[in-house]
Amino acid sequence: MAANSVGKMSEKLRIKVDDVKINPKYVLYGVSTPNKRLYKRYSEFWKLKTRLERDVGSTIPYDFPEKPGVLDRRWQRRYDDPEMIDERRIGLERFLNELYNDRFDSRWRDTKIAQDFLQLSKPNVSQEKSQQHLETADEVGWDEMIRDIKLDLDKESDGTPSVRGALRARTKLHKLRERLEQDVQKKSLPSTEVTRRAALLRSLLKECDDIGTANIAQDRGRLLGVATSDNSSTTEVQGRTNNDLQQGQMQMVRDQEQELVALHRIIQAQRGLALEMNEELQTQNELLTALEDDVDNTGRRLQIANKKARHFNNSA
């Protein structure tokens, strides 16, 4: 797919590492995107990781299949070992998908290094303008319908809620809800906009319900000959301006986004801690392996020394 400056992708970039080519001295891993297939050596993935960390100035938070350690060499696992190749293939695919589809942290994929690695092309200017035009038209159409609904919910000239207007508004709201569900299925809107529109629909539907409730209470009061007292919650809803409603919905969306960002930071911190612990464990394992090798060497030397001592005693 043509990437919208990769860091601003509205759709998930599906990446597969689904093929390998084994050469006499190295292995090529086939990377597939919706419009490209590239073959990369493991060393190229490693170079991508290290260069990103150097340019961004931080440890990359995504899991990466590490180079063979002391244990792999001890077990004589070669570069063309089938099990190692499959482990790397799965790990590299996971690494690329996390790197290019992180919704919260786009620093890594926005770099020129990351874009060049998968040869992500710039969007065609005419296509980009066409997409922007469609998005603008959709937003204008939505805003016009919302404006009509709010006009339907305005009070009558005598100050009483418009029941007929509420019925008309409810019909339009149901149409807007169906339209929003279709947009969600098509993934044509960003998640923040979907959240904002859904919250606005819920608010307007509640306003319709409040008008109906107030009308029933008023009719009951007339039948009983008693003037009904104003319902405080209805007054509050009716007294709100269009600007108040929009500001309330925008604040709700901002609060939700802040909570998600805070949660993401906690998860990233935990992942970074886990990576550090894993590195420490690997270091400890290497030290233990080296110690085991030293013990084995010392044991062999002692055996040789004992043989020489016995031979010397026998000859004496």
From Swiss-Prot:
The lineage of its organism: Eukaryota, Fungi, Dikarya, Ascomycota, Saccharomycotina. Residues 250-312 form the t-SNARE coiled-coil homology domain. It comes from Saccharomyces cerevisiae (strain ATCC 204508 / S288c) (Baker's yeast). Keywords: Coiled coil, Vacuole. Essential for proper morphogenesis of the vacuole. May exist as structural reinforcement on the surface of the vacuolar membrane and be required for maintenance against rupture by osmotic pressure. PANTHER family: LD15323P, SORTING NEXIN 17 AND 27. Present with 2360 molecules/cell in log phase SD medium. GO terms for biological process: amphisome-lysosome fusion; autophagosome-lysosome fusion; cytoplasm to vacuole targeting by the Cvt pathway; intracellular protein transport; macroautophagy; piecemeal microautophagy of the nucleus; vacuolar calcium ion homeostasis; vacuole fusion, non-autophagic. The keyword Phosphoprotein does not apply. Residues 1-124 form the PX domain. GO terms for molecular function: phosphatidic acid binding; phosphatidylinositol-3-phosphate binding; SNAP receptor activity; SNARE binding. InterPro entries: PX_dom, PX_dom_sf, T_SNARE_dom. CDD domains: PX_SNARE, SNARE_VAM7. GO terms for cellular component: autophagosome membrane; endomembrane system; fungal-type vacuole membrane; phagophore assembly site; SNARE complex; vacuolar membrane. Residues 168-186 form a coiled coil. Its main location: other. Possibly multimeric. Associates with VAM3. It is found in: Vacuole. Pfam families: PX. This is Vacuolar morphogenesis protein 7.
